[in-house]
Every structure is written in C-alpha cells, then in structure tokens.
Amino acid sequence: MNLYLTLFSFCFLAIMAEAASEIPEKFFGKYDLDRSENFDEFLAAKGVSWFVRQMIKLAKVSKVLAKNETPGKYNMENLTSKKNTLYHGWELGKTFEAEGLDGVAHKITFSFKDGVLSEHHIRLNDPEHSAETYYYTIENDQLVMKMVNNGITCRRWFKRSTGKK
C-alpha cells in the first residue's frame, strides 16, 4: 500500500510540474503596441544614438504568441514596420539560436515562472556584455513587457488585437 501511495504521489507531482511548465492560454494572441514608459531612456542607457532611438520609437510593433502545432512547443513573432523576427517551435527552458531584431545571431531561452514569461537573449558576437531579459505579464488583458538596463526600467503595453494575425 505504501508503494502505491508513493508511486501515486510521484506521478501526481510529475503531472503538476509538467502543467506548471506550460504557458497559460491568456498569453496567446496578437498584441499591438499601445504605449511605453521610459523607452527612450532605456535605449539611451544601452548607448543607442538619438537618431536611431527616434526611428525605433516610430516603428509599428506587434507581438504574436501562439502554441505551435507540435505539443509543448510555442511560437513568438515580433512584427515591426522595419523587420520581423519569427521564433517558431521553441520549448520552455531550451535554448535555441536565431536572429534578433538587431540583425545579429542570438542564443534565446524562454521560461515561465510565477505568472511571468521571460525571454532571455545573448548576442553570439558579444556574449560577455549582451545579456538581456524581457519579462511578459498579462494585466487587464494587455501584454506588458518589462526590460531593465543600467538601472532604467522600461515598460511597454500591448493591446490585444481584435483583427487576424
């Protein structure tokens, strides 16, 4: 009887751990940039020139987060008026390589913990100084992205789109 209870407990914990490693449904959808807080200051802290900051701030930005057709895998798309990045078929906690919005190859890892989806990037051409993590939460049916650099915290709010992808 004790063996069955132990086996049941182990299976239950394994199932709960698996369920906790999934992105909740409320995150899935297409989101369009609505507003930003400290975005210019954040870019300046990263050393981005004034002219380039103005170009970046003018860009239309949408994010699409979806389940991939393969169970346990996901897709994230960053759609901008300048360049798109399409990260398809990634798994939580597994690092993959892809091109970032800056045109440079990145190592990227997505994780989900305590209601927060994180997207961690390391540029392959400067791994010692380039680590960045973006944190996503859902607040009032909006996707909220948080970034920090040199003590500057930036937040960007994306409204859920009612249109098709």
UniProtKB/Swiss-Prot annotation:
Keywords assigned by UniProt, alphabetized: Lipid-binding, Secreted, Signal, Transport
Keyword set includes Transport: yes
Any single Gene Ontology cellular-component annotation: extracellular region
Primary residence: secreted
Domain of life, source organism: Eukaryota
InterPro entries: Calycin (IPR012674), Fatty_acid-bd (IPR000463), Lbp1-4 (IPR040094)
SUPFAM superfamilies: Lipocalins
Tissues with expression: Expressed in presumptive hypodermal cells by the comma stage and in posterior body wall muscle cells by the two-fold stage. From L1 to adult stages, expression continues in body wall muscle cells adjacent to the pseudocoelom, while hypodermal expression is extinguished.
GO molecular function ontology, one term from the record: lipid binding
Signal sequence extent: 1-19
Cysteine disulfide links: none
Subcellular compartments: Secreted
Domain notes: Forms a beta-barrel structure that accommodates hydrophobic ligands in its interior.
Function: May play a role in sequestering potentially toxic fatty acids and their peroxidation products, or it may be involved in the maintenance of the impermeable lipid layer of the eggshell.
Entry's family note: Belongs to the calycin superfamily. Fatty-acid binding protein (FABP) family.
Name recorded for this polypeptide: Fatty acid-binding protein homolog 3
